[in-house]
């Protein structure tokens, strides 16, 4: 209820990954397992380049949302909806906050198993994250200030 009340009171909310799923469900959408998980750097297709670039963006999820009634999907890929707006709020399935330090923490706290189960090499993922970091920061700053003016 708190999430729904905040959004319906026209307070800007940014839901990241599970937070976006929580927003979708609170607003009348649904969340269910996707056809497969998404772990790692993934391209998305954005219909609102003024709000969100195509990426790549870092993913670490197994579920996906159904955009709630009144929400507008603004980005997707073949696996899942990747972003929606609802009033002044936005839900994103990916992790714009991710950098190498964050990924190291996730891997150290149990993510190594998930990455391995997904058939990926954690060192390659870390190397790609280090390489993506400058561009990822730029993409994140591109959409972050605009989120409050949706």
Regions found by a protein language model. Give the residues of each.
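Glycine-rich, phosphate-binding/catalytic loops in enzymes
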Residues: 1, 31-32, 76, 108-110
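Short amphipathic alpha-helical segments and helix-helix/interface helices
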Residues: 3-4, 81, 144-145
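Catalytic nucleophile loop
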Residues: 20
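Flexible gly/pro-rich beta->alpha loop and the following alpha-helix that scaffold active-site loops
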Residues: 1-14
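Pocket-forming structural segment of enzyme catalytic cores
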Residues: 24-102
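Acyltransferase
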Residues: 103-150
């Amino acid at each position: 209820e708190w999430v729904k009340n905040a959004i319906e009171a026209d307070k800007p909310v940014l839901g990241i990954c599970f937070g976006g799923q929580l927003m979708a469900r609170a607003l009348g959408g649904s969340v269910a397992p996707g056809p497969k998980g998404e772990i790692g750097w993934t391209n998305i297709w954005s219909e609102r380049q003024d709000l969100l670039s195509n990426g790549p963006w870092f993913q670490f999820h197994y579920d996906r949302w159904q955009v709630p009634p009144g929400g507008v999907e603004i980005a997707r890929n073949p696996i899942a909806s990747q972003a929606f707006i609802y009033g002044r709020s936005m839900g994103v399935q990916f992790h714009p906050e991710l950098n190498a330090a964050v990924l190291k923490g996730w891997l150290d706290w149990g993510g190594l198993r998930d990455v391995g189960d997904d058939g990926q090499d954690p060192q390659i993922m870390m190397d790609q994250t280090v390489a993506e970091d400058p561009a990822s920061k730029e993409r994140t700053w591109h959409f972050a200030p605009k989120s409050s003016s949706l």
